[in-house]
């Protein structure tokens, strides 16, 4: 999963007036009744993992929602029940810190648009003309920045199933009957030997004039850096970090760690993109 960072606020007058939505307060006000929301044929519901992290789930099984709302099952029990039968529902994870959030989505989990629908559907207070905004924070790391990286280590290349090379890679591995609708993507990890710099290889891939990948993340140092930092490059340049944990507690801990590690970048992006938000 990828933990993407977003700004949350309400706006009017074409974005000139911006106010905080106090997301943490609003979500916690819903939890006592285990509120869910029907959107079309799907149901959205939210449960708390810890003080800042929430499990946000989409399902089309009304009986599951009723069962969860009547039970005292932990979010771990809920997530495990979804994992046992993937047709029941799909989770995403939400980390809230002030007017910014971390949002990690499984393949079919609810999106940030679903979160917007949920907030509005559950009665978030909006004045006339106001809109809820969940805006991706865009980082400054670009291909040009890579040229100035002092050291590049482990590099992960994402190849989406829609790309022609996806099937070629599976065939090299021995697959013969490839049904495209079954797959989302492949992650190819290029792992160097201990303390070896693979900057040349990483740059060749990044600057490939005919790219056969969608996203790249890499562990790198810039010219002034003394530690390896995770850099995530995509067409949109969305500020984000990969998550590799399994349990809810691990995911919550990792999302908090990602936020703390990238806080300066997050706040800088927020200041540059959004500016001042009124209480």
Swiss-Prot record:
InterPro entries: RexA. It comes from the Viruses. Pfam families: RexA. May confer an overall protective ability to the host cell by triggering a growth arrest and avoiding lethal host gene expression. Additionally, may confer symbiotic protection to the lysogenic host against secondary infection. This is Protein rexA. The lineage of its organism: Viruses, Duplodnaviria, Heunggongvirae, Uroviricota, Caudoviricetes. The gene is rexA.
């Amino acid at each position: 999963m990828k933990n993407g960072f977003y700004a949350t606020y309400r706006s009017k007058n074409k974005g000139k007036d911006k106010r905080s939505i106090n997301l943490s307060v609003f979500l916690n006000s819903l939890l006592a009744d285990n509120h869910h929301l029907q959107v079309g044929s799907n149901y959205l519901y939210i449960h708390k993992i810890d003080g800042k992290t929430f499990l946000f789930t989409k399902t089309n099984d009304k009986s599951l929602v009723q069962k969860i709302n009547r039970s005292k099952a932990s979010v771990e029990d809920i997530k495990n029940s979804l994992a046992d039968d993937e047709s029941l529902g799909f989770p995403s994870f939400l980390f809230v810190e002030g007017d910014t959030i971390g949002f990690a989505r499984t393949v079919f989990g609810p999106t940030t648009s679903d979160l917007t629908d949920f907030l509005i559907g559950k009665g978030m207070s909006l004045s006339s003309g106001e809109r809820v905004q969940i805006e991706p924070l865009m980082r400054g790391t670009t291909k040009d920045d890579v040229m100035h990286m002092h050291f590049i280590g482990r590099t992960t290349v994402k190849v989406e199933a829609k790309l022609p090379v996806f099937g070629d890679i599976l065939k090299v591995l021995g697959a013969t009957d490839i049904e495209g609708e079954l797959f989302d993507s492949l992650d190819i990890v290029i792992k160097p030997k201990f303390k070896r710099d693979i900057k040349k290889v990483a740059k060749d891939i990044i600057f490939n004039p005919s790219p056969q990948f969608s996203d790249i993340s890499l562990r790198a140092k810039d010219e002034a850096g003394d530690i390896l930092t995770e850099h995530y490059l995509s067409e949109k340049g969305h500020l984000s970090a990969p998550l590799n944990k399994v349990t809810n507690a691990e995911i919550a801990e990792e999302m908090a760690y990602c936020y703390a590690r990238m806080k300066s970048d997050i706040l800088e992006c927020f200041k540059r993109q959004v500016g001042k938000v009124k209480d």
